[in-house]
Amino acid sequence: GLGDVYKRQPNFIPAWNHQAKLAVAGKEWLDCNARGVSKWTGLSFLMNYFGLTPDEVCCFGDNLNDIEMLQNAGESYAVSNARAEVIASAKHTCPPYWENGVLQVLKTFLKETTNPF
């Protein structure tokens, strides 16, 4: 079943959301970031540093704290056991972690690309 944090989020996220960006990140975890900071803003910083565009980025996610990143990256995968709203945010799905889903996708990329980096 869903963890306690997910069940209780309606009680505390509205009270704190004006000060920080809160997102359920697992059964018992809650990400608390400064407003305007997310996995996507971190990835955007790295893209800028390396001169990459969103179309040159692939990301993987499994929880609510990944949605913005999944929506904006050129290629995005949600693991198949993620929540429905996370899967809807990604362009693709991959098998769950216990089936090495991320590794399966990365192996496919590496086989298809002569210079992946």
Residue ranges and their predicted role:
Residues C58-F60, Y77, H92-C94:
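Hydrophobic/aromatic beta-strand patches that form the interior of the parallel beta-sheet core
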Residues G1, C59, S76, E99:
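Short glycine/serine/threonine-biased micro-segments
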Residues N72, S80-F117:
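Asp-based, Mg2+/Mn2+-dependent phosphohydrolase catalytic module
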Residues G3-F60, L64-M69, N81:
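Conserved acidic, metal-coordinating active-site core of Asp-based
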